[in-house]
Amino acid sequence: MAIIQSGGAAGTALLIDPTFAAARVAMRPVDTLGWNSVGAATGNVSALVINNTAFSFRNFASNPIIVRRVGVGFITTTAFTAPQQISFGLLVARSFTASDSGGTAIAFTGNNCKHRTSLGTPTSIDCRIASTTALTSGTRVVDANTVAMQAGWSGVAGTTIAPGLNNLLGHDAGDYPIILQQNEGLLIVNLTAMGAGGSGITYIAAEFAEASAF
């Protein structure tokens, strides 16, 4: 068994397996101030048009936000007069000067949505999901292209897009996550206009961490 020691610290720093010449390491999360997950649902929405916002997340703080997962789903509660596609996109919004408004605000206060009680509470975030109508857009610069999209076919009432934890964004160890600096955020927007007669509920899931630096 080979041992690698740090020149600046006593004791064993790294073990090397002699059979496979592989390092023995323990994977751990990145160093963060706090780690949170959230799941939420809209009200029963209808008549959404293209680029209506279903979910908005803005980082007010100077600390960066590391986004690990984002997911979306849609359940058709009342069938549309004509069967149609339902689709959503994940967009990065930059240079916020006014947050989106309306809908239901999601507060990350106290221990709400923490992965561990002893972790810090997010410094300053505006997070909200649409109610029975779309959110009202604030002032921000939205990227021209989506980071990801999800779509499904709505022919009858039922599952159109199966709700997922990471079907819009999934960050694995070693990948570079989405980093939201101060006054940057993420939006989940409707990409296909909803036709007559139908309605449904949108579900979102997100996982993120606040760090002192990244």
Regions found by a protein language model. Give the residues of each.
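Intrinsic-disorder/low-complexity loop/linker signature
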Residues: 1, 18-21, 103, 121, ...
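A broad, low-specificity signal for short, low-complexity segments enriched in glycine/proline
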Residues: 18, 26-32, 49-53, 145-149, ...
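C-terminal interaction-tip segments
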Residues: 24-54, 59-68, 73-111, 179-185, ...
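Short, intrinsically disordered N-terminal pre-domain segments
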Residues: 1-19, 214
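Extended, solvent-exposed segments with strong compositional bias
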Residues: 114-178
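N-terminal compositionally biased, intrinsically disordered segments and leader/signal-like regions
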Residues: 13, 43, 98, 133-134, ...
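Intrinsically disordered, low-complexity segments enriched in polar/charged residues with Gly/Pro
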Residues: 1, 43, 163-166
